[in-house]
Amino acid sequence: MSFRDDVLAGLAVRPRAIPARWFYDRQGSELFEAITRLPEYYPTCTEAAILEKACAELADEVGRGLAVVEFGSGSSTKTRVLIRCVEPATYLPIDISGDFLREAAAEVASEFSGVQVIPFEADFMRPLALPKAVAGSRKFGFFPGSTIGNLEPAGAVDLLRAMRGSLGEGARLLIGMDRVKDQDVLLAAYDDAEGVTAAFNLNLLARINRELEGDVPLDAFRHRAVWNEGASRIEMHLEAARDVAFTAAGERFAMAAGETVHTENSHKYTPEAARLLLRAGGWEPVREWIDERGWFSVILAEARPPAAAP
C-alpha cells in the first residue's frame, strides 16, 4: 500500500494505527539518526561496541570478499565497523529513503574505495529481488538495530523468510536483537529528555500535511511511549491532547482527547525467543555476542536448508 492508502486505512480503523515504515522520509531519517546519538538510546552505541569487540571472530566466521547486503541502511554508521572487519567486495545498502540512502552510500564509497557500493532504494519489508550485480556473490545479510522488533511476530517471520529467499542458499545473516530489560531503561530510550523521539513521532503527522494536503494541528498531539509487558514490547503512540478534527488526503477525521494513533512497536526478546524467531524464519543461529550488561545481542545465523525451514 502507498503512504496515502496506509494513512487513510489506519485513521479509519479502531484502534487507529499507521505503519512505522512511513516515519522515514528525509526529515524522519535525519531525526532517527539524531535519536541514535542520544545518551538514553542505548541500542546503537551498545551494538556498535559489540561489533567492534567481535570483529576478529566475525571475520573468521564469514570470511572476506563477499557481498554485504544491509537491510535498512540509514547512515550506515555500524556498517563501517562491519566493512573494516570482513572487507567485502560489494556493499549493497537497501533503504526506503532514496536521497538519504544515496548520500550515505556515497560517503561509504569515498571511505572504502576498494568496495563496490550499490545503493538500492526499496522497501525491504516486502519481498524483493536483489540487483543482478550481486547475483553470483556469496551474500552476507546485515540487519542491525533490532529493527526486526518493529514487526509483529508473524510479520517478523515473514521478513526473515523473505531475506532468506533474497540472499539465497549458503547465505549468512548478522542481526541485532534487543533484549528484555528494566522498564525504566526501555521507556527512557523511547521518550528522551530532549524530545527528539517526540519530534520523530510527530514528524509522521507533519509528513501527512506535506504530502497528503493535510491540516493536522501538530500542537494537538503529544508523543507517548508505553511498555506492554504482555507483548514484550515498547509501543509508540500519538495521543490527542484535546478533541481535534483534521483533513488528510481529502478525508475528514475527528479524534477525542486521549485517543491515540499507534505508530510503532519495538519488541524485546529473551535469548530463547530470539532463537525461536530466527529458526521459524529459516535461519539457524550459529554464534551470539552480547554486551557486558546483557542488554543487546548480535547473532550470526546461516540459511537453513529449505526442508529444515518451517
Where are these regions (language model features)?
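Conserved class I S-adenosyl-L-methionine
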Residues: 65-74
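Conserved SAM/SAH-binding beta-strand->alpha-helix loop
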Residues: 97-99
